[in-house]
Amino acid sequence: MSHRPKRGRERATLIGVIISVVGAGIIGLTTALTLADRGHSVTVHDPAPASGASHHAGGMLAPTAEVVYKQDPLFPLMRTSAEWYPELITLTAKYTDLPTGYRTDGTLVVARDIADKTHLSELGEYQSRHGMAVDKLTVRQARKLEPALSPAINGAVAIDGDHQVQPRLFTRALLDACRSAGVTFTGNHVNSLDALEADQVVVANGLGASALVPGLDLRPVYGDVLRVRVPQHQYPLLTRVVRGFVEDRPVYLIPREDGTLTIGATTREDGRDQPQVQGVHQLLRDAIELVPAVEECDFVEATAGARPGTPDDLPYLGRIDERTVVSTGYFRHGILLAALGARVGAELVDRQEPAIDLSACDPRRHS
């Protein structure tokens, strides 16, 4: 029995360029879907789709809360990608009914002690100077929004523009959407770009890109992430993302629709790819300091993933030759920057002028 080809594949067959995308994490999948929607014939090569950094990520779309001092070139990328995210969610929904976990509830950032309050205040001033919307709250106001917060916190701010997706749901939806759009998947591990039969190639396989493209200075930055389940009688424990500082250590708690909380994340460069006891202990301790009822939750899992970092923490995003576009090195911001990576990656493949200045992201800047 023959089946009528899906609309996406019909368009690709008629007008598309043949494109290979190396890597099926969040960047590779969103780029592949965007290219397929533009009418191209797309093949994705990855022996284990959505099993790398995307599998372990928290999924915060937080261009304001994720601000780090002295990383000014990163801010416009983060803000722009956050603005483009609704379009990416809409594109995904065009090809699949599977959920993405996209939520626009906003974020609270809280301070545990007086020193943390000072840090939060100084960070808020820095964010405001860069045009970011941050609303200062009293402890009473913060606890009215999230009653599970500890009465011992010392300060809080609300960031309504910081949202979230659930990465495991999102990548599952993207895989389904890509297939519906006509994308082909192989389980191949790519050892050489020359072996790919394609007009254009997008290298989006995270840390593995350095084996395919000389001159990329990528390093693995590991992070421990926890998941706990909220008891039914306490659900929902939180209604929005809660980030905080505990003795100057950052921690976040992300509520999910399935009744779990994601708690993260440590940052280490020790080469150890399993969750570390010290990191698990630190995250639980700090989460309980901010939300005491976490102590009553069921422990679900601890995972550790390697994020692809660069020397300046900016991604490698750009064309390196007539056939090859590089899109990797997104470090801690891969989920957030996926909307930008997908759209700009597709623009580069189509030889269009990118919608944002990419000069700081030149893949050759460290070679």
Model-assigned labels for residue ranges:
Residues 18-43:
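N-terminal Rossmann-like FAD-binding beta1-loop-alpha1 element of flavoenzymes
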Residues 22, 197-208, 342:
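Short hydrophobic core segments
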Residues 27, 50, 208:
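Conserved Rossmann-like nucleotide-cofactor binding loop
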Residues 33-38, 47, 60, 98-102, ...:
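Active-site substrate-recognition segment that forms the wall
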Residues 46, 138-139, 186-189, 301-303:
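Short loop/edge segments at beta-strand edges and connector loops
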Residues 60-141:
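Dinucleotide-binding Rossmann-like beta1-alpha1 core, especially the glycine-rich loop
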Residues 157-193:
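Helical element adjacent to the flavin cofactor pocket in flavoenzyme catalytic cores
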Residues 297-367:
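C-terminal catalytic lobe of FAD-dependent flavoproteins
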